[in-house]
Amino acid sequence: MLPQDKLDLILRRHEEISARLTENPDAATFVSLSRELAGLDEVAQAIRAYRDEMTEISGMEAMLADPATEPELLALAEEELQDARQRLGAFEQHLRIALLPKDADDEKSAILEIRAGTGGDEAALFAGDLFRMYQRYAEAKGWGVEILSVSEGTAGGYKEIVAEITGKGVFAKLKFESGTHRVQRVPDTETQGRIHTSAATVAVLPQAEEVDVEINEADLKIDTMRAQGAGGQHVNKTESAIRITHLPTGTVIFVQDERSQHKNRARAMSLLRSRIYDAKRQQLEAERAADRKAQVGSGDRSERIRTYNFPQGRLTDHRINLTLYKLDKVMTGEALDEVIDALITDYQAAQLAASEGA
């Protein structure tokens, strides 16, 4: 049975927040209430849909129990009642998922970091392929993509690329992409047709706002320098490149991609906030891991999560034993949702099983 008292409390809170937002609260309160309301919208809608269906079923059951109901209506009501009960089951399942504890960062934008791993030039090329896959996927979703930092590979692709992906719910969709991605294919430079294996690591961080992380300017060491090209030569005459070191954590951010020192500093600070926030998040996750029963993989970014086998056109996600023979569509971003949605569904199923067994 669903906890009706809890459902009542959620609806009352949803209505209370909606009312308070019409009273012109101060900016900080408005932001806080808006976030809370956004977190309750889905579950409030699910509760109302579930209860509306319950009301419909009660009405049909009363009609069937009424001896005055005309015979021709009885058959119609019985058929409609069966359909309504099926809909109710779907509404209840959706509501149970909506009631699961929410990741507070799910609605945030994200920082995407891709780094070439083992495999030399081929790893850098694969890192480039992965970035283009996520870029196309993001564009299809209507999200914004802005490159924050890039180090190009000698034969193409990227040794490292960091990008900001902005939009509602970006982190919820991409957070399970963190880990080691392995590729198996024949490089263009391979003359004997041998399959090579290389890898790239992906890290997806929730984008932190200033309200999420407080950074003391006294804790920062900021160096400016002239931006450098791939061969180490200076590419402009002004000291536009920025290196920020967060002394308490030792986190170092270097950004040189804009000609403006001001823009590079803003990008570096945004990335620094997200790195510090994510480090705290990872620490909390590690502390909870012993008690948490529902998890897709370990979340460890060194964990091999997926293999892309180009000769066979096969993608395998090792965490949920998912295999798709449509690698070309995954790499264009077209079929990536099939993988992501399967991971989310598996995670939610594990959460439901854990909550029901608690």
Swiss-Prot record:
Methylated by PrmC. Methylation increases the termination efficiency of RF1. It is found in: Cytoplasm. InterPro entries: PCRF, Pep_chain_release_fac_I, Pep_chain_release_fac_I_sf, Prokaryotic/Mito_RF, RF-1. The modification N5-methylglutamine is found at residue 233. Its main location: cytoplasm. Peptide chain release factor 1 directs the termination of translation in response to the peptide chain termination codons UAG and UAA. PANTHER family: LD18447P (PTHR43804:SF7). This is Peptide chain release factor 1. It comes from Beijerinckia indica subsp. indica (strain ATCC 9039 / DSM 1715 / NCIMB 8712).
